[in-house]
C-alpha cells in the first residue's frame, strides 16, 4: 500500500461556482432519500484512539484487530484510483480514513470520490497502521452525514483575515487548532475557579441581569424597556449590590460568574459584553481578599496550563512568586521617580501634569476631583502600563471608591485594591462599606457628579440602603475579569481572541 504526498486540491473556480456545484450534489442526495441522516452514533474519538494506540505497532494491530466507529469533518481527501485516504477531524482531533471499493463497495466508493472537503462523514472499520506509521481506520462502512455547501479556507493560508475570524468564528474553529485550544483553556480556567470557590465553601448564585437601577460600578449602562411593567430597565453593569444583599440575608460566602454589559467603547481590552466573577465573603477584609485572589489565579493557571509560569507576548510572567503590593503614589514614584511627595500632593501641579499627558481635566469627572482622584489619573498615565509583574495597587481614595470601606487610620483612603499584570487591570476588590449612612452620603455625592455631567457616576439605590440598614457583617468582595485572565493564560493579545463571538460592526 502506498501513500501520496499530502496536497490540497487546487481551487479552479470561484466560491460561487463551488457552492453551485455543491448544491447540485445536495440536490442529487435529496433525490436518493435522506440527505442529512441522523442515525449514526460514533463510539470513539480521534484523540482517544491516537493516545490509546500510540504504542501499538502495525503487527500488534494486525494480530489484535480493533473495531471502531468515528465521525467528523473531512479536512483532506486523496483519491488514488482503487485506494483513497481522508483526514477526518472530530471535536478531539484528527484521524485518517483508508477507503477502498473492496471494503466499502463500489457504489459507496464512487460516491466518496464526489464528496467534498468540509463534509461530515462517518465510518466503521478496523484500526491499522500504514507503511508510514500513521494510525488509520480501514473503513468497512462509510457514510455521508452532512453536506457542506461552502468550501473551507485554503489549508495552507487558513483564515488570514482577522476580522473574518471573529465574524465567522465557526469557520475559525474548524480550521485553526490554536483557536480551539484557546477556548478549551478558557473552559478549564472557569472550571478551575468554580472548583476553587467550592473548596473554599462559597455558594454559586445567579442574580438579575435586568436592573431597575444600574449600580455596582462606574459605567454607562445599556437601557431597555420592560413592556409588561412599563418601566425603564438597565442591563446590569455589575452584580455587586445584589450579591451584597445576599450577604445581608445570611449567605456568608457567595460568588457569581456571569455577563456584565457596559455601553462603552471597544478596544483590545474592552468588549461591551464581558464575563466577570464576583465573590463576597463575610468576616474578611481586603488583605484577606488579596491573599485569596492571588491563590485563585495561581491555581487557575496551573489547572489550565499545567504551570504557574506563563509566556505572554514574548515575555515571561511568573505567577508562582508572591504578588507585589504598592500604593498609588508608590507606583507613580517607582516608574516616574522624579516626582516628589510635595508635587504629588499639589492640586495645581497634578492638573498641569495631566494636561501634559493629554488628559482633559475640564471634563465633568475632574471638575471637583480631589487630590486622590488626580493621583489616580496620573498613575494611569505613568505607571499602569509598566505593571508587568502581578501587582496589587492598594489604598484607593474614597472619592473614586463609593462602595468601599474607608480606612480607620488614613483619612480619605479606602481599603481597596486593584490587581494589575502585563499592564492591565485583572481584579478589583475591597473591604465593603457596610455603614448605611455613609453609603447613602456617598450615593448622594455620586448623584451630584451625575447631575454635573458624569455619565458613569452611580445612581442612588434606596433599596440597597434599606438592606444595609438591616445590618451587613464586615465583608470583603472582589471582581475578576475572566476574559482578561484568559487572555493572559492563552497568550492572546486582544479580548476578541478569547470571546467566541465578539461584538463587531455590522457587515453592511
UniProtKB/Swiss-Prot annotation:
It is found in: Cytoplasm. Its EC number is 6.1.1.6. Keywords: Aminoacyl-tRNA synthetase, ATP-binding, Cytoplasm, Ligase, Magnesium, Metal-binding, Nucleotide-binding, Protein biosynthesis. The keyword Phosphoprotein does not apply. It holds the Pfam family tRNA_anti-codon. Mg(2+) 2 binds at residue 425. Its cofactor is Mg(2+). It catalyses: tRNA(Lys) + L-lysine + ATP = L-lysyl-tRNA(Lys) + AMP + diphosphate. InterPro entries: Aa-tRNA-synt_II (IPR004364), aa-tRNA-synth_II (IPR006195), aa-tRNA-synth_II/BPL/LPL (IPR045864), Lys-tRNA-ligase_II (IPR002313), Lys-tRNA-ligase_II_N (IPR044136), Lys-tRNA-synth_II_C (IPR018149), NA-bd_OB-fold (IPR012340), NA-bd_OB_tRNA (IPR004365). Mg(2+) 1 binds at residues 418, 425. The keyword Protease does not apply. It comes from the Bacteria. One of its GO terms (molecular function) is ATP binding. GO terms for biological process: lysyl-tRNA aminoacylation. It is an enzyme of class 6 (ligase). HAMAP family: Lys_tRNA_synth_class2. Homodimer. This is Lysine--tRNA ligase. It comes from Burkholderia cenocepacia (strain ATCC BAA-245 / DSM 16553 / LMG 16656 / NCTC 13227 / J2315 / CF5610). The gene is lysS.
Amino acid at each position: 500500500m502506498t501513500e501520496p504526498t499530502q496536497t490540497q486540491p487546487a481551487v479552479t473556480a470561484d466560491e460561487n461556482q463551488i457552492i453551485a456545484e455543491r448544491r447540485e450534489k445536495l440536490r442529487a442526495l435529496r433525490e436518493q432519500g435522506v440527505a442529512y441522516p441522523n442515525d449514526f452514533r460514533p463510539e470513539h474519538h480521534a484523540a482517544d484512539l491516537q493516545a490509546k494506540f500510540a504504542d501499538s505497532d502495525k503487527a500488534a494491530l494486525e494480530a489484535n484487530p480493533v473495531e471502531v466507529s468515528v465521525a467528523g469533518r473531512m479536512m483532506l481527501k486523496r483519491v488514488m484510483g482503487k485506494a483513497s485516504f481522508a483526514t477526518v477531524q472530530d471535536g478531539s482531533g484528527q484521524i485518517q480514513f483508508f477507503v477502498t471499493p473492496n471494503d466499502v463497495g463500489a457504489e459507496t466508493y464512487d460516491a466518496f470520490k464526489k464528496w467534498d472537503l468540509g463534509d461530515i462523514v462517518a465510518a466503521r472499520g478496523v484500526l491499522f497502521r500504514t507503511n508510514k506509521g500513521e494510525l488509520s481506520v480501514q473503513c468497512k462502512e462509510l457514510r455521508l452525514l452532512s453536506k457542506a455547501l461552502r468550501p473551507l479556507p485554503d489549508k495552507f493560508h487558513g483564515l488570514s483575515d482577522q476580522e473574518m475570524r471573529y465574524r465567522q468564528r465557526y469557520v475559525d474553529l474548524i480550521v485553526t487548532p490554536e483557536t480551539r485550544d484557546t477556548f478549551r483553556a478558557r473552559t478549564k480556567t472557569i472550571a478551575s475557579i468554580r472548583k476553587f470557590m467550592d473548596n473554599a465553601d462559597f455558594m454559586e448564585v445567579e442574580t438579575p441581569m435586568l436592573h431597575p437601577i444600574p449600580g455596582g460600578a462606574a459605567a454607562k449602562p445599556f437601557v431597555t424597556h420592560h413592556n409588561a411593567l412599563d418601566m425603564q430597565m438597565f442591563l446590569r453593569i455589575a452584580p455587586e449590590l445584589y450579591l451584597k444583599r445576599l450577604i445581608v440575608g445570611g449567605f456568608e460566602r457567595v460568588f457569581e460568574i456571569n455577563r456584565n454589559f457596559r455601553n462603552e467603547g471597544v478596544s483590545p481590552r474592552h468588549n461591551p459584553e464581558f464575563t466577570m466573577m464576583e465573590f463576597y465573603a463575610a468576616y474578611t477584609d481586603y488583605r484577606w481578599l488579596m491573599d485569596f485572589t492571588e491563590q485563585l489565579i495561581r491555581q487557575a493557571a496551573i489547572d489550565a496550563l499545567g504551570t504557574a509560569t506563563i509566556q505572554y507576548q514574548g515575555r515571561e510572567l511568573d505567577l508562582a512568586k508572591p504578588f507585589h503590593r504598592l500604593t498609588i503614589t508608590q507606583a507613580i514614584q517607582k516608574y516616574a521617580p522624579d516626582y516628589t511627595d510635595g508635587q504629588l500632593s499639589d492640586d495645581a501641579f497634578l492638573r498641569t501634569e495631566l494636561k501634559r499627558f493629554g488628559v482633559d481635566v475640564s471634563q465633568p469627572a475632574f471638575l471637583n476631583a480631589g487630590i486622590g482622584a488626580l493621583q489616580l489619573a496620573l498613575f494611569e498615565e505613568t505607571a499602569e502600563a509598566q505593571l508587568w509583574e502581578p501587582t496589587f495597587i492598594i489604598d484607593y481614595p474614597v472619592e473614586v471608591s463609593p462602595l468601599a470601606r474607608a480606612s480607620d487610620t488614613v483619612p480619605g483612603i479606602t481599603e481597596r485594591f486593584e490587581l494589575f499584570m502585563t499592564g492591565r487591570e485583572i481584579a478589583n476588590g475591597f473591604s465593603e462599606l457596610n455603614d448605611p449612612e455613609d453609603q447613602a452620603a456617598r450615593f448622594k455625592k455620586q448623584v451630584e457628579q451625575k447631575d454635573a455631567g458624569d455619565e458613569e457616576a452611580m445612581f442612588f439605590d434606596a433599596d440597597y440602603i434599606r438592606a444595609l440598614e438591616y445590618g451587613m457583617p464586615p465583608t470583603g468582595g472582589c471582581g475578576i475579569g475572566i476574559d482578561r485572565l484568559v487572555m493572559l493564560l492563552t497568550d492572546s493579545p486582544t479580548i476578541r481572541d478569547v470571546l467566541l463571538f465578539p461584538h463587531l460592526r455590522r457587515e453592511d
